[in-house]
Amino acid sequence: VKVTITAPELCPRYIAHYVKDIKIGPSPLWLKRRLALCGLRSISNVVDITNFVLLEMGQPMHAFDLDTIEGREIVVRRAFDGEKIVTLDDKEFTLNRENLVICDGSKPAALAGIMGGLNTEIKDGTKEVLFEAAKFARDSVRRTSRSLGQHSDSSAIFEKGTNEYTTERAMKRALHLIEQLGCGTVTDVCADVATEYSDTKVKTMTVSPEKIDALLGIEVPVEDMEDILKRLNFGVKRSGNELELTLPRYRDDIFAYPDIAEEIIREYGYELSLIHI
């Protein structure tokens, strides 16, 4: 399986994993129930796995019938002006260069981050599946979704932003469920493409507890700050009068002092800060 990304600014990361010996059938009762409780109907074991991972981990996934992928090649690119695609809900769209598409060797197979194409859907006779987990630029998904009037659970999540750590974990979770449900054989064939826009570096920050206290308007013991941040999976090391922090890989929402202060006060207790106001 070959993956090529020609629009790296719109797709920083793309993971594709090949699963063979697929046995399409109904999902077990526990999976049907969990989907139903979230307002989703059960479709088939393979499709249900992708929907379950979306709900459980907040990472949209997609499954392609590999026999419909020409040349067993995935190309992530901008659509050509006038290019057409029919999505899984049987709607036809005319595309332009503002739209990002997942293609095989010759044609679009999915609207990136929004919905798969009808020509590559999972059917009862599907024997080979290519699972997709990716990170798409939120602005790109938003523009395409709004310009085409095509919205989905996946587009709603991508528009808010996803992170690559969750992308990796979601793929592993989906493959684990394939094995757990016994509906396919997970192979070692995997393409994991990280572009120059990929961001997998460990993020660090150095903060002053004194400045945190000034922001909060109360004095939080340094030991409590350390304990709270460690419980939130931050790496914490005391260096003189400062704390050196290593941010969890899945926390893309932490940028500055106010973000750290918010994490601390939420755990320490807003009611305690009110006493001092």
What is each of the regions a protein language model found here?
Residues 1-274:
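RNA/tRNA-interacting regions in translation and RNA-turnover enzymes
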